[in-house]
């Protein structure tokens, strides 16, 4: 199963060098993001220009035959999302993800008529009913469904079947190595285009897995081990947070005038 690697550009590394390294390692595509979450105030106009320059470097890094994609992280307002998508179109992105906020999927009908880049969306979506309008009306090119969010393997397969009959590809959102193992099997049974998302190039060790999925030359392979093909060691699990009494708010991002904008 071909992979797209999701990786923030490391300090002191040039984006095109990181992109080239991922393609050289065998990954099908390299994904970047608008990545405005590092600060509390974001100037959207400056951010659009900065991201455009980043995209040019990444395209240079992957070469004319390599693939790259970008996640807008639902950060941009409609005019900026359209403007940036159209500016990067000549750079031939494999897809552009989450151009705008996901609460109103029908707005992708407007986007479909104003941008020509392949559109990916859906990591925040739940069961099949939330996908119906987008898939049946051909408003997206890739579904970013993920097993934990949609409600399990059966529901994921139903969404995949709908995608298959409407020529929509699958690029499941990474939600951890166990769900990733399940989605490898699901995507292996999918006849349309499919990519698996890997965090940090798939090189991160998972100490709580005695047996992990098989990653070779940038590709994920189903294996013949029982179940999902991974083995969890519960004794190595570690509690990372307790949210019974309080919870951490997502970052609050503001425009230069002090008004709140989407994270």
Protein language model regions, located:
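Structural signal for hydrophobic packing residues in well-ordered secondary-structure cores
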Residues: 59-62, 92, 187-191, 241-244
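Extended hydrophobic packing segments that form well-structured cores
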Residues: 228-263
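Shared catalytic-loop signature of beta/alpha-barrel
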Residues: 86, 92-95, 103-227, 231
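Short leucine-rich amphipathic alpha-helices used at interfaces
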Residues: 38, 204, 210, 254, ...
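Pocket-edge structural micro-motifs
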Residues: 2-4, 217, 224, 234, ...
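Alpha-helical structural motif
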Residues: 54, 179, 233-236
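Metal-dependent enolase-superfamily TIM-barrel catalytic cores that perform enediolate-based chemistry
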Residues: 2-109
């Amino acid at each position: 199963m071909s992979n797209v690697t999701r990786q923030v550009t490391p300090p002191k590394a040039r984006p095109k060098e990181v992109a080239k390294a991922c393609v050289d390692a065998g990954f099908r595509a390299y994904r970047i993001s608008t990545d405005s979450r590092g600060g509390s105030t974001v100037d959207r106009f400056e951010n659009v220009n900065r991201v455009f320059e980043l995209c040019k470097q990444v395209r240079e890094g992957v070469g004319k035959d390599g693939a790259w994609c970008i996640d807008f992280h639902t950060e941009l307002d409609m005019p900026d999302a359209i403007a940036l998508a159209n500016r990067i179109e000549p750079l031939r992105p494999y897809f552009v993800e989450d151009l705008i906020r996901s609460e109103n999927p029908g707005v992708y009908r407007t986007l479909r008529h104003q941008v020509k880049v392949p559109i990916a969306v859906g990591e925040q979506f739940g069961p099949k009913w939330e996908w119906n309008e987008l898939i049946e009306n051909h408003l997206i090119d890739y579904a970013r469904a993920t097993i934990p969010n949609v409600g399990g393997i059966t529901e994921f397969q139903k969404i995949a079947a709908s995608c298959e009959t409407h020529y929509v590809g699958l690029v499941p959102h990474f939600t951890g190595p166990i769900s990733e193992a399940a989605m490898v099997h699901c995507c292996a049974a999918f006849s349309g285009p499919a990519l698996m998302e890997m965090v940090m190039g798939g090189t991160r060790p998972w100490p709580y897995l005695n047996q992990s999925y098989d990653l070779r030359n940038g590709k994920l392979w189903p294996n013949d081990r029982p179940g999902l093909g991974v083995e969890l060691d519960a004794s190595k699990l570690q509690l990372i947070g307790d949210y019974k009494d309080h919870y951490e708010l997502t970052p609050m991002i503001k425009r230069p005038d002090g008004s709140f904008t989407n994270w």
